[in-house]
């Protein structure tokens, strides 16, 4: 299989969304590796404003200078197929459409995830398959840099949730030899895979420490409230414009219906409550071991009771979020529940009652939140093997295991955690990071994004973090701001 880009194999499409139209040249479903495990997934599509080919420009960018916007569709560590500009899997106009309007080249690469199996029934989507595939896609672009539209030295990755974690990995593990055996296995090009910048919405990352971080935040709240997606049966038909055509989502290329959400409410068992306390007590030790500091040089630490400068730092960022809303003229205090934890004086957000704020947000997951002692989480499946569906990935949950589960190798866990590579001089890091974790997002602890941002900043990497007001677990909700950020670092 050739990895040469065929610039003559394209179509010109007119795409209209929300009253706006873009004409783009599309190069679709191009294999980016020579030996794919799931051929219908391990491919990419390229979308280019057609005006570039007429010698024109948009927003100061042309065919050769345009940044390459590289979103992924990974969620829950499931497979993430290519997604054309237009509608996303929820039926909303996606970031790729607006990126074209802003003058970017869009590259949408599919990637394997949990649930993918080959003809022999082997699990081929376990870690580190997803990040390996995305790296292979970057290498394909570099392999064809003389033919590919856009600037391959200005690749900006973007993702949400597990996709945000993948974006953070792309930005922290560039060209690292740890991934080389996996890249060779799928026949990736022998090229660089570092990227220029990474946009990470609510990254579900630092998985081997996510349980302790979650309980630091939510310990003491024993009732949980969430909504889960009820997946349709394999092979069940769908006329949904996106999900109905997503290859490999069910692991076998089956057609999928639009997602339906089912509420789940309950109370943790006494055993889970005890585990919550244990995990909570372990977080300060982990946080202090990182030796983090803020932009003023103040050490970020926690006392044994979970309070300290790190908590104050998180609260300070939450106050910035509230202040942004107040400055925009929004009456955020009209909600009596907000008034229970946020104090505003003379138009200034001055303090947050942390415990009341956490109670306002509510707990979403039982303890342990990610490495369940009885397994069954998306992350347990992520760390499976070709013939074992799921495994533990923390010593704590292995010690408290209730189902006789095995534990993943440390190397497999390391490959999925950007924290291990930020200080590694061999890894080429992105120059810029943008991290957004909604103020009411409960899928992982606020601490996870804060720790990632502090670690990046301590390494001298330009990092922009915020907790947008009222935003739950979501991404791409502030595209004008995202694109302003991209323009600010690319022009």
List PLM regions with ranges:
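Short, solvent-exposed loop/turn and secondary-structure capping segments
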Residues: 56-57, 79-85, 117-121, 152-153, ...
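Cap/lid segment of the alpha/beta-hydrolase catalytic domain
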Residues: 71-131, 171-173, 471
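C-terminal subdomain of alpha/beta-hydrolase-fold enzymes, centered on the catalytic histidine
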Residues: 316-491
């Amino acid at each position: 299989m050739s990895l040469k880009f065929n610039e003559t194999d394209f179509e010109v499409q007119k795409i209209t969304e929300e009253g706006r139209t873009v004409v783009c040249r599309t190069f679709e479903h191009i294999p980016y590796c020579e030996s794919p495990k799931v051929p219908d997934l391990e491919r990419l599509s390229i979308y280019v404003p057609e005006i570039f080919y007429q010698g024109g420009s948009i927003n100061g960018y042309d065919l050769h200078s345009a940044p390459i916007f590289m979103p992924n569709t990974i969620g829950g560590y499931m497979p993430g197929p290519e997604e054309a500009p237009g509608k996303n899997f929820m039926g909303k106009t996606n970031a790729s459409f607006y990126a074209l309007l802003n003058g970017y080249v869009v590259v949408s690469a599919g990637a394997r995830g949990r649930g993918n199996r080959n003809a022999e029934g082997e699990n081929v989507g376990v870690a580190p398959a997803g990040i390996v595939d995305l790296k292979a896609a970057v290498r394909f672009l570099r392999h064809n840099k003389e033919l590919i539209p856009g600037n391959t030295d200005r690749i900006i990755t973007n993702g949400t949730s597990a996709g945000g974690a993948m974006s953070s990995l792309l930005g922290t593990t560039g060209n690292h030899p740890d991934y080389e055996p996996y890249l060779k296995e799928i026949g990736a090009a022998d090229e660089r895979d570092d990227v220029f910048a990474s946009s990470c919405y609510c990254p579900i990352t630092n998985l081997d420490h996510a349980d302790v971080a979650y309980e630091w935040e939510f310990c003491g709240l024993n009732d949980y409230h969430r909504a889960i997606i009820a997946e349709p049966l394999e092979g069940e038909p769908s006329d949904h414009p996106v999900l109905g055509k997503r290859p490999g989502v069910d692991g076998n290329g089956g057609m999928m219906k639009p997602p339906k959400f089912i509420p789940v409410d309950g109370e943790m068992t006494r055993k889970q409550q005890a585990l919550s306390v244990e995990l909570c007590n372990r977080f300060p030790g982990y946080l202090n071991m990182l030796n983090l500091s803020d932009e003023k040089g103040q050490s970020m630490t926690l006392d044994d009771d979970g309070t300290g400068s790190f908590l104050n730092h998180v609260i300070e960022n939450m106050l910035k979020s509230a202040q942004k809303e107040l400055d925009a003229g929004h009456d955020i205090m009209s909600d009596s529940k907000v008034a229970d934890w946020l104090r505003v004086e003379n138009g200034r957000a001055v303090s947050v009652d942390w415990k009341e704020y956490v109670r306002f947000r509510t707990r979403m997951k039982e303890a342990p939140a990610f490495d369940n002692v009885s397994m069954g989480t998306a992350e347990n499946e992520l760390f499976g093997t070709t013939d074992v569906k799921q495994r533990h990935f923390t010593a704590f949950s292995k010690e408290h295991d209730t189902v006789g589960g095995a534990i993943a190798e440390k190397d497999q866990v390391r490959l999925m955690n950007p924290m291990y590579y930020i200080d590694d001089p061999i890894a080429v890091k992105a120059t810029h990071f943008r991290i957004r974790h909604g103020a009411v997002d409960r899928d992982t602890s606020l601490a996870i994004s804060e720790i990632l941002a502090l670690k990046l900043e301590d390494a001298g990497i330009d990092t922009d973090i915020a907790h947008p007001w009222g935003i739950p677990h979501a991404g791409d909700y502030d595209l004008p701001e995202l694109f302003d950020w991209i323009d600010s670092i690319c022009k």
